Amino acid sequence: MATTHLDVCAVVPAAGFGRRMQTECPKQYLSIGNQTILEHSVHALLAHPRVKRVVIAISPGDSRFAQLPLANHPQITVVDGGDERADSVLAGLKAAGDAQWVLVHDAARPCLHQDDLARLLALSETSRTGGILAAPVRDTMKRAEPGKNAIAHTVDRNGLWHALTPQFFPRELLHDCLTRALNEGATITDEASALEYCGFHPQLVEGRADNIKVTRPEDLALAEFYLTRTIHQENT
């Protein structure tokens, strides 16, 4: 079936290991309830009617993905990821077909809310560069002295945001910016940073702070709490 300008492809880079989780199992394959974190993250994307396909970039040596129901899902495409996140995203973009817009979502960010996703997707009607979900910084921020666990100074938090995912951009623009940034040796920490490097200014779409990324062991219980609460709210 041919895509329309409203159809969106999502790319999920899932080739990382996540050593801060202190576990032999890659964090995206840890379970919350009866599903892995990766499954929760992908199903949140597919729950929106505009998301027609999800491309998941996994490690070439990954033997776990094939055991998941996702492996046989008709809307899922699997590609080999790279050593770095940007390499995996580029591999996903190449498999995104003719989708005009793409979402990029962390494999270990399972608590995405549908209202946040809908507001992010609405950027395709008003923006040529796209944007990201983000949360305003609420805590006092401190800059450490170089090489020391000592405060150098307090950072003004006004105008500071925590970057979240999904991040949402025109497919060709993201591909070109990632390619240029990598070729020129730029440091790419997320997809938006590639656009910033090329002179673009993506929009900030305020999202819920409970859209957490599971990075450390204590995050797993917190994500389970948020997911359980969300499911309860949707069923009442």
Swiss-Prot record:
Pathway terms, separated by semicolons: Isoprenoid biosynthesis; isopentenyl diphosphate biosynthesis via DXP pathway; isopentenyl diphosphate from 1-deoxy-D-xylulose 5-phosphate: step 2/6
Site (Positions MEP for the nucleophilic attack): residue numbering on this chain: R157, K213
The keyword DNA damage appears for this protein: no
Lineage top rank: taxon: Bacteria
Record site: Transition state stabilizer: R20, K27
Signal peptide residue numbers: none
UniProt cofactor(s): Mg(2+); Mn(2+); Co(2+)
Keyword Phosphoprotein: no
Catalytic activity: 2-C-methyl-D-erythritol 4-phosphate + CTP + H(+) = 4-CDP-2-C-methyl-D-erythritol + diphosphate
Keyword entries, A-Z: Cobalt, Isoprene biosynthesis, Magnesium, Manganese, Nucleotidyltransferase, Transferase
Activity at various pH: Optimum pH is 8.3.
GO cellular component: cytosol
Function, as annotated: Catalyzes the formation of 4-diphosphocytidyl-2-C-methyl-D-erythritol from CTP and 2-C-methyl-D-erythritol 4-phosphate (MEP).
Record-linked HAMAP family: IspD (MF_00108)
Protein name (Swiss-Prot/TrEMBL): 2-C-methyl-D-erythritol 4-phosphate cytidylyltransferase
Source species: Escherichia coli (strain K12)
Phylogenetic placement of the source organism: Bacteria, Pseudomonadati, Pseudomonadota, Gammaproteobacteria, Enterobacterales
Gene name tied to this protein: ispD
